[in-house]
């Protein structure tokens, strides 16, 4: 059986490893380095350069040199991050069927195609090192990558000629490399600050089991943002002195980017650095030079909010894991940007303990991917990896409520089912609207997709049994099916590709969910009592119509009047929960005589009002489904 390689496809740099002779080994590239710049360039001669050769010519070829492509993987052009991404790069980002792509010399390339060039080089380097053909790989992604981004990564692997056996999260991969030989039980926090993404994951490691307890992060927070802070500062200083924006010059922007990256690296060990860019532009009086001194203190002041945000994600991850900072045994720093002194200082002060520096931050993720490859190949025994889904998943039900089937933090792979029903009599079809997020209402969450189950036999509301099943595989790809249990008819949808969430949207939803928790709860309570009232009206009128002679005319009139009163209240969109409940109670009270008559007539079968049932984890529960 051929070797299976592990690949860390990074925003700034990528790395490849293999598991052999009982350990993960980093494979050097043809240039003799353990990491390869995630840069692709197209030259005027028609050559395609990847890695260091592409990086070396970037300043003289800015519009045809593609870097940080990972930031637009699976990104839709109508998402805020697309516009921001264009303002930070020298190449052109364009709309390709709604998705972000790049245009080079009039030709459009997808992020998958560009990423495939990087993966192709890593594959070739691995084949040269191993002396054998490589086809299978495990590729890592940020823990907060959405469905579209994960799918795009898989497609990039396919384009590169790789069979992607598994997509795993970067912090989880790092924990595999760290904890493979650990014997005791530990609670570990992985702080992964890379070139373009940030993830924090809390795991419990012990006896070969790696269980993710929680994860949080931002796929648009990383080393690029620290570079951009310096670039923006330099551009502002230049504009203040010269009166125009130097960033409009693509070649000058590339020089600023290189200078900012170098300054950031120098400030990791020095207290100050000089940025010297001669002939950066031309003015009326001749050439303009840009020379600035930047201190570490100034740099840390400019990027303080970025570091503080990483702490916010740590706090969320700890809360969701049900742990305090004192419960964490080890803090593992992963990603090249963890070389920033301020990042180390802030995390160390927060936990009040030393950080684990025993892993190489640039290589540990690829090493972990190689370990997972070894597990899949059978070379690594007795290792169980339990990862989680980052956000709740569910469907829209009556009143616009999002009914969750899979909660945030659920271990994957996972398959869960729940039975729903129709909201109207003789309803011929139901629309299944799949949503992702933490808010109480579907409209406040991300719509992942919609499909219809039709040809439902005519039946009273609440009778059809529609079983909805959510199935998430080990790669995080979601499949949803709906089945009429009465007829066996089924319809399915795979949630992948461009329908996924952007990470900025995920962050926003989580924050909004917390901020609007109380308001959402009140709105949900009104929806629920409205549903209850609607169901009572329906059942009471139907029962009264079928048994109008069972009670007196006065009792019948009292029920009709109470029903009309409740119906009038429901027409008022601003009616409060208490107002509806008052009218609901009146109708219930007036219907007691009818219920008693039915009880006597049918020997104990209650025919009174039945409130809508709430969704539960039990598959046999039935609740109203939203109808489009």
From Swiss-Prot:
Keyword Cell cycle: no
SUPFAM superfamilies: Actin-like ATPase domain (SSF53067), Heat shock protein 70kD (HSP70), C-terminal subdomain (SSF100934), Heat shock protein 70kD (HSP70), peptide-binding domain (SSF100920)
Entry GO MF terms: ATP binding; ATP-dependent protein folding chaperone; unfolded protein binding
Chain residue ranges for the region called Disordered: 595-628
Keywords for this protein: ATP-binding, Chaperone, Nucleotide-binding, Phosphoprotein, Stress response
Superkingdom classification of source: Bacteria
UniProt xrefs under InterPro entries: ATPase_NBD (IPR043129), Chaperone_DnaK (IPR012725), Heat_shock_70_CS (IPR018181), HSP70_C_sf (IPR029048), HSP70_peptide-bd_sf (IPR029047), Hsp_70_fam (IPR013126)
Biased composition (Basic and acidic residues): 595-604
Residues with Phosphothreonine modification: 197
Induction statement: By stress conditions e.g. heat shock.
Family annotation (Pfam families): HSP70
Classification via PANTHER family: HEAT SHOCK PROTEIN 70KDA
Membership in a protein family: Belongs to the heat shock protein 70 family.
Function: Acts as a chaperone.
Protein name: Chaperone protein DnaK
Organism per entry: Aliarcobacter butzleri (strain RM4018)
């Amino acid at each position: 059986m051929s070797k299976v390689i592990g690949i860390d496809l990074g925003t700034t740099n990528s790395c490849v490893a293999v598991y052999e002779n009982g350990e993960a080994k980093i494979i050097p590239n043809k240039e003799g380095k353990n990491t390869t710049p995630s840069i692709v360039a197209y030259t005027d001669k028609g050559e395609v350069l990847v890695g260091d050769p592409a990086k070396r010519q970037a300043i003289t070829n800015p519009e045809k040199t593609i870097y940080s492509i990972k930031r637009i993987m699976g990104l839709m052009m109508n998402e805020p991050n697309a516009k921001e991404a264009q303002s930070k790069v020298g190449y052109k980002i364009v709309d390709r069927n709604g998705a972000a792509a790049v245009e080079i010399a009039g030709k459009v390339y997808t992020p998958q195609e560009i990423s495939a060039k990087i993966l192709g080089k890593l594959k070739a380097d691995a084949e040269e090192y191993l002396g054998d053909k490589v086809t299978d790989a495990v590729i890592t992604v940020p823990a907060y990558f959405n469905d579209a981004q994960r799918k795009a990564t898989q497609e990039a692997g396919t384009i590169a000629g790789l069979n992607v056996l598994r997509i795993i999260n970067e912090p989880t991969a790092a924990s595999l490399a760290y904890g493979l030989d650990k014997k005791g039980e530990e609670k570990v926090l992985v702080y992964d600050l890379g070139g373009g993404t940030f993830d924090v994951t809390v795991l419990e490691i012990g006896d070969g089991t790696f269980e993710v307890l929680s994860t949080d992060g931002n796929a648009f927070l990383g080393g690029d943002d620290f570079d951009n802070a310096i670039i923006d500062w330099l551009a502002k200083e230049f504009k203040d002195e010269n009166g125009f924006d130097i960033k409009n010059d693509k070649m000058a922007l590339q020089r600023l980017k290189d200078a900012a990256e170098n300054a950031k690296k120098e400030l990791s060990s020095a207290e100050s650095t000089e940025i010297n860019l001669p002939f950066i532009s031309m003015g009326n009086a001749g050439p303009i030079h840009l020379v600035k001194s930047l201190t570490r203190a100034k740099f840390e002041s400019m990027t303080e909010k970025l570091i503080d945000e990483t702490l916010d994600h740590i706090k969320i991850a700890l809360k969701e894991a049900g742990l305090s900072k004192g419960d964490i045994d080890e803090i593992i720093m992963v990603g090249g940007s963890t070389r920033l002194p301020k990042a180390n200082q802030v995390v160390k002060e927060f936990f009040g303990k030393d950080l684990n520096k025993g892993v190489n931050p640039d290589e540990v993720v690829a090493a972990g991917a190689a370990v997972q490859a070894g597990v899949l190949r059978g070379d690594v025994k007795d290792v169980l990896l339990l990862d989680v889904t980052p956000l709740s998943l569910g469907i829209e039900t009556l009143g616009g409520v999002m009914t969750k089937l899979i909660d945030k933090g659920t271990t994957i792979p996972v398959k869960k089912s729940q039975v729903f029903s129709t909201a109207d009599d003789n309803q011929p079809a139901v629309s299944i609207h799949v949503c992702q997020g933490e808010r109480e209402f579907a409209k406040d969450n991300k719509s992942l997709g919609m499909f219809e189950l039709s040809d439902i036999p005519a039946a009273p509301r609440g009778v059809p049994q529609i079983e909805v099943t959510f199935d998430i595989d080990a790669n995080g790809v979601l499949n949803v099916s709906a089945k009429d249990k009465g007829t066996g008819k089924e319809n399915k949808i795979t949630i992948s590709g461009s329908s996924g969430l952007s990470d900025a949207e995920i962050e926003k939803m989580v924050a909004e969910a917390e901020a609007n928790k109380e308001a959402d709860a009140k709105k949900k309570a009104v929806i629920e009592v409205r549903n209850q009232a609607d169901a009572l009206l329906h059942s009471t009128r139907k029962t009264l119509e079928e048994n109008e002679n069972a009670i007196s005319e006065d009792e019948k009139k009292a029920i009709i009047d109470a029903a009309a009163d409740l119906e009038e209240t429901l027409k008022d969109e601003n009616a409060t929960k208490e107002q509806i409940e008052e009218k609901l109670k009146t109708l219930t009270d007036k219907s007691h005589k009818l219920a008693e008559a039915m009880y006597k007539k049918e020997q104990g079968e209650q025919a009174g009002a039945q409130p809508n049932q709430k969704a539960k984890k039990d598959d046999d529960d039935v609740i109203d489904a939203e109808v489009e």
